[in-house]
Amino acid sequence: MQRKVEVLVIGSGFGGAIAARRLAEAGVDVLVLERGPWRDTVPNRSLGLQNLAPLPQGARAYTHGLRNIGSHRLKKDLVLNRKGFIEAYQGDGINVICSSGVGGGSHVYAGFMDRPLVPDYWDNRHPDLCNAQMEGYYEELLATYKARPLTDSDQVPNAIEQTSHDGKLRCLGHPAVAFLMPQVPGQPARRVEDGVERWECDMANNSFLGSPSGAKTTLDFSTLWPAMQKGLQVQALCEVTSIHRLSPDRSAPMRYEVRYRNHANGRDECILAEHVILAAGGLSSVRLLLRSRDQARGLTGMPRLGLGFGGNGDYFGLWKENSDKDLSKGMPIGSPFRLKDSPNQSVLVLRAAIQGIDSVPMPGPCGAGCAGSR
């Protein structure tokens, strides 16, 4: 007999994990399909999770750093390691980097949790949606992830106030961060809360290569695991390949057939669902819908699918700071800033530290490669 579920969630990042948690708490039968694996971190080990795949730390950056590489010029992605961490895609006018694993983008985000810059961002978009309504959700998430703004008492290295180049840079405030900050600054300690073991932030390795210590709050242990105690099912290494709308049948509530590749056993499988929540990220969600409609012929309609696709406005720049400080220490991304006298009211500049890179073996004078070389 074919497997059936009331709600199927595709993707376990911020969209999928939070939706799945809410539904599971309401007693709904929910299954999450995630193409990536559970990651090997202190919190996940403490929960007794099995089949953990490494983060791209140290030499693992070469074996588990990239999952696949794609381009609008290629007919097919180049898959390097299905347990790899990063998907890199070169598009026509946009480049996308996203993570793969249970918890989705929470493994590579900087831990910032901030409201939109535009005060009325949610107003006049839909009759049932407004800024006042969204504020309640912002407050709920900040409380759930125990996120708070940094203060001087946290003694974070390389804060903008400390590296403003004699006042040329102006800090624009401190957004809330979802990090386990040290109770004693400079002395990160082990903490266990609700059965989850974590280490406080060491200001050194919680960036885009993941947070092995669990200092950064990720969705696997903070959102999905608690929901699993209330009935949520999560299947890792299951990559959805197409979605098919079923013919209406009043005697059967199932409305969709979802086909996926189970990378754990190498089989193509499928499941019937009454409802499907597609939360596989901006790139993968659009790609899956296009494939389901145009290749698998499982969906119809959606005439504007793929049009107006864009990112969240990020541009990457590289400049030399000539600092006598180790700017990799501190938070993964510093608080937003602008030039002191800038008239601009919309652009934010953020200093990013690619922490953990010093543990990756690099070619050096020693010939075979020296760990820690830059």
What are these model-predicted stretches?
Residues 25, 29, 35-53, 214, ...:
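Glycine-rich loop(s) and the adjacent beta-strand/alpha-helix scaffold that form part
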Residues 63, 70-73, 91, 127-239:
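Conserved redox-cofactor binding core of oxidoreductases
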Residues 1-4:
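A short, basic/flexible loop-to-alpha-helix module at the beginning of a structural domain
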Residues 6-32:
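N-terminal Rossmann-like FAD-binding beta1-loop-alpha1 element of flavoenzymes
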Residues 17-21, 221, 225, 286-290:
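Short, hydrophobic alpha-helix immediately C-terminal to the catalytic nucleophile
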Residues 11-13, 103, 280-283:
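A short acidic Gly-Thr/Ser loop motif
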Residues 52-150:
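Redox-cofactor-proximal catalytic regions of oxidoreductases
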Residues 78-97, 105, 109, 127, ...:
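FAD cofactor-binding and catalytic pocket of flavoenzymes
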